[in-house]
Amino acid sequence: FIIQDWGLFFEVKRTMPGIETHISTQANIHDDRGTLWCREQGADRVTLSRELSIDEISVIHNAAPDVDLEVFSHGAICFCYSGLCLLSSFAMAGRSANRGMCAQPCRLPYELIDENGRSLSPAGRERALCPRDTNTSQLVRRLYDAGAASLKLEGRMKAPDYVYSIVDVYRHQIDDMLADVSTSKDEDAARQRQLKRCFNRDFTHAYQDGTSGDEMMSYERSNNRGQIVGTVLGSRLANRDVRGLKPDDRRRRAAIARIELFEPVGKGDLLELRHDNEFDQFLTTIAADDAAAGDVIECRVPRSMPEGCRVRVIRSQRAIDAAGAALKRDVLRRRAVDVTVVARLGEPFAVTLTCCDNPALIATATGFTVEAAKTRAVEASDLVEHVGRMGSSPFEAASFDVSLDAGCGMGFSAVHKVRAAACKALEETILA
């Protein structure tokens, strides 16, 4: 369980003492005293407050080296401290952020006025409370050295392509770090490109650096920025009207925009064209084909856009396709077991499975009586092959111990039945 409420935490520990418990980042644990207290109460892991710097994480780890620390590493951050923000509750009819119902009022535009009603809000800073998104993909080594045992990546209520792309990048970053592998500049650029083409409000790691100034804020907009990939060179009118426009808007004729790319785009990518001087005026179009950095492409758009407009990829078709393919794969997390096979002449054939991570979890199944071979005698390698076929069970064989009398004969379909019975018996033992 991931728990923020202390009453619930103590009730879970009382009624289900064997259940693993993690303290949520919403509990706002931000120092060594709080972390040590969580350990004393029996928490298995503490997810630290998102506002901590790497140096502060290191101090906590040094004070409590035996506590698993989870660190928020990628995704949206709040204007207020983790777990202590009541703005949504007060401003949005009781929609509590601590109950998963945050209405995100910090993302809205606000006007700052003085006591005389005069506006003090500078142009381009309408969203005064809107932070960027955290991205620590290039700080994985520093977080690991500071004592982070787990990285927390935002995923709740996110699209499958977002979750797949973000986890994919961090998985590679962690694996490369643990293997002490240096990545090339091209590979680093490709991974950052993959992150930027997921939903983001631009990126920051200000909290990890111990700062909290303008470098962590997204004053201009709170929606998806994507990745800037090019600029508009110009537009020409297309010889057709724009479908869906009202008759008096027919003057807004469809156009073809010429776009110079400095980043590659893929067929099907959703492109956003937006002018810096008219930030609320934008349109979207679809990339018709793959194109490389340096290419000039043409895209149909609902109206002409002036030269100099920025072009962003705000949705990657490649990421959507990769996530879709991953979701179709049969991904089953299996538990490793040690397998013992006993085949003695005149005795029942027996298969014993023992969980590698907990030898107390063990189950045995017996079946047919082993007889002398009438044709070919069974060898140990045959039993390893056929008993090792765990099929759709939640187990996978980690090791084999085969005791086999010479000259034994048996049908492999009967072997499969005993193996299946052993798997079922072990499942029942685990769930008991």
Predicted regions: what they are:
Residues I3-Q4, T15, I19-E20, L36-A432:
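Surface-exposed amphipathic alpha-helical tracts and adjacent flexible/coil segments at the periphery
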Residues G7-L8:
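Alpha-helix capping/helix-boundary segments
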Residues V12:
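RNase H-like DDE/DDD metal-dependent nuclease/strand-transfer catalytic core used by mobile genetic elements
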